[in-house]
């Protein structure tokens, strides 16, 4: 595989520690390219890339791009970043992350999973399935897949499984042979501006599927179903609906596992089990059953693959137990994800749930405040902390205080505001033996779980 014919390329990633950027960087490193990058902080991800031969520097500086051939950025990188400014001055090509991902995908049959929620889990399941089936895929995922030990995998096979990011429209760079859409909810409206523009973006993504490919669409979701009259590519649907081409029935949630019967139209494919928490994961697994069946993977192989899936970090990850308290961490940061994860915690444990939630981005808090206000009903106790800005400037009215007031106004009886540095100590005062503590959010809330465990063990 060669992306550059003239000479080995030196590829530089601005913000290489991001989960989406690092996966592409790792694949390129494994292909033998000279990869460098910068990030504001050191992390497990940057240390891993350095161990693979990447040149990773802390902080952003113009001299980091002096000897590179191409600069890769994500939508989180500002145009006044010193490395971007210097690359522009030197006329070094600057390309978005999705364009580099698309270049890798052009050499493979792409399996691209998109959707407002569930895409990391579904992408991980799909990559695990193809690996289990002996197809040795390349994969780039938005989370660390436990069976791979990474968020990226370089395979020798013909398939590449990727998580398609709709947040900035960059998934429209991706050329999918198989495109999956799990759901479409109002999200990332700072980029899309309107829900109709977001819907049109997903439609354009689906219609990029070539004549020999297939779109796999969740008919249970009304916005996804509304696309069907306008879809020009060949497609099949999946869901619990009796109109679905691939249907799940007899869904059973039992502890840390979900089981369901799968049908292709009226033909039974058998009963499947996946060790994931929450009823919603039946549909994520069903999407993978549909992928496998459309690719000709035998149902027995799919059944074995789903049963052996080891999960994804920060997707209902049990961080530990101390003092009779179990601490679980999850990336959920959209109201629909919050609801599903809290319900999953209740179904899995049947115990009191204490939720530590960190809102992510001012724009999301502002745009989805009414939805957030009713998302925490399955939390017995809610400790709400400061908004994680993710590079955004504050917005008047988009505050944790406003969110707490909205949640209380909708009837929640136990909501407290706690500054992030005090969160673990506040949780320590509220928990009791038998509780489930769920840390929720896409920011640094993930560190609160280990902090609490340390206090409980002291």
UniProtKB/Swiss-Prot annotation:
* Localization in the cell: Cytoplasm
Q: Does the keyword ATP-binding apply?
A: yes
- A single Pfam family it belongs to is Mur_ligase_M
Question: What superkingdom heads the lineage?
Answer: Bacteria
Q: Which Gene Ontology cellular-component terms appear in the entry? A: cytoplasm
Sample GO molecular function, one term: UDP-N-acetylmuramate-L-alanine ligase activity
SUPFAM superfamilies documented for this protein: MurCD N-terminal domain (SSF51984), MurD-like peptide ligases, catalytic domain (SSF53623), MurD-like peptide ligases, peptide-binding domain (SSF53244)
Which top EC class is given?
ligase
- Asked if the Swiss-Prot or TrEMBL record annotates the protein with the keyword ATP-binding, the reply is yes
Enzyme Commission no: 6.3.2.8
Q: Which keywords belong to this entry?
A: ATP-binding, Cell cycle, Cell division, Cell shape, Cell wall biogenesis/degradation, Cytoplasm, Ligase, Nucleotide-binding, Peptidoglycan synthesis
Q: Which reaction does it catalyse?
A: UDP-N-acetyl-alpha-D-muramate + L-alanine + ATP = UDP-N-acetyl-alpha-D-muramoyl-L-alanine + ADP + phosphate + H(+)
Pathway annotation from the record: Cell wall biogenesis; peptidoglycan biosynthesis
> Which annotated residues bind ATP?
115-121
The UniProt entry, under InterPro entries, shows: Mur-like_cat_sf, Mur_ligase_C, Mur_ligase_C_dom_sf, Mur_ligase_cen, Mur_ligase_N, MurCDEF_pg_biosynth, UDP-N-AcMur_Ala_ligase_MurC
| Single biological process term from Gene Ontology | regulation of cell shape
| Similarity comment | Belongs to the MurCDEF family.
Q: What does this protein do?
A: Cell wall formation.
Q: What is this protein called?
A: UDP-N-acetylmuramate--L-alanine ligase
Q: Which organism is it from?
A: Anaeromyxobacter sp. (strain Fw109-5)
Q: Gene name?
A: murC
